[in-house]
Amino acid sequence: MTQLSLKKIYSGKVRDLYEIDDKRMLMVATDRLSAFDVILDDPIDRKGEILTQISNFWFKKLAHIMPNHFTGETVYDVLPQAEADLVKDRAVVCKRLTPIKIESIVRGYLTGSGLKDYKATGTICGLKLPEGLVEASKLPEPIFTPSSKAKVGDHDINISYEECEQLIGVELAKQVREKAISLYKEAAEYALTKGIIICDTKFEFGLDENGVLTLMDEVLTPDSSRFWSVETYQEGTNPPSFDKQFVRDWLEKSGWNKQAPAPKVPADVIQKTVDKYKEVLDLLTK
């Protein structure tokens, strides 16, 4: 990644944050790829640009549901032109918000950790589901299944709605659940018209200086969501997804112990992953 004249205040698995002032920051999506909570050595070319374009598309499309982290400024308002030219497709000027301390996950279909919980208990995060559901079953209604935010390198833990209320308060939990489900429903309905099923997704929320709940970070990207193709979807199977699954599958078969450092991923696996991210962008925005 290029060096910027702003002060870097945080480096996450994918995004770097730079301080502009006490109210604004610059969020830059890198080409880093993480799998199994380990950052891989090989970046995915243009991934940061594609993720930013997908996120920006959704932020604008869903802006009528709730406020988001945009300030309305561009990178050219806060960086010298030469630096702005380098990051213009992968950076956004954002409000500095106080993050809500939970991961806000909405599921419309049964798979992943939700399927494991359901098989064991008939519930997900304490929510009772109908009997007889199988892998990739569509749920009667989308459900809000929060998890606790883990430190970098640890795994998030699914929590019940009651635990969510204890963590962030009854009123805020209600607001977060309602907004998360509204965002998911509208996005899922739109994506379906483009041949994409949004199986599940994770939203990030924060509070602004006036305590207003605000959508932040990234929205409905292949990094934060599971996207399936309508064409290959079949209940009872594990449908292929538009994301880093190629890389995860290759790593699973490589015999790697899932501890850093990760093995070098072959170029063709990296390329297939880029193609999948690009396909999502094209399908959603054209």
Swiss-Prot record:
Family annotation (InterPro entries): SAICAR_synt/ADE2_N, SAICAR_synth, SAICAR_synthetase_CS
Pathways per UniProt: Purine metabolism; IMP biosynthesis via de novo pathway; 5-amino-1-(5-phospho-D-ribosyl)imidazole-4-carboxamide from 5-amino-1-(5-phospho-D-ribosyl)imidazole-4-carboxylate: step 1/2
Source taxonomy: Bacteria, Pseudomonadati, Pseudomonadota, Gammaproteobacteria, Pasteurellales
EC top class, as a word: ligase
Domain of life where this protein originates: Bacteria
Protein's name according to its UniProt entry: Phosphoribosylaminoimidazole-succinocarboxamide synthase
Family in the record: Belongs to the SAICAR synthetase family.
SUPFAM superfamilies given in the database record: SAICAR synthase-like (SSF56104)
Enzyme Commission number(s) of this protein: 6.3.2.6
UniProt GO MF annotations: ATP binding; phosphoribosylaminoimidazolesuccinocarboxamide synthase activity
GO biological process: 'de novo' IMP biosynthetic process
Keyword terms of this UniProt record: ATP-binding, Ligase, Nucleotide-binding, Purine biosynthesis
Annotated catalysed reactions: 5-amino-1-(5-phospho-D-ribosyl)imidazole-4-carboxylate + L-aspartate + ATP = (2S)-2-[5-amino-1-(5-phospho-beta-D-ribosyl)imidazole-4-carboxamido]succinate + ADP + phosphate + 2 H(+)
Organism this protein belongs to: Histophilus somni (strain 2336) (Haemophilus somnus)
An example Gene Ontology CC term for this record: cytoplasm
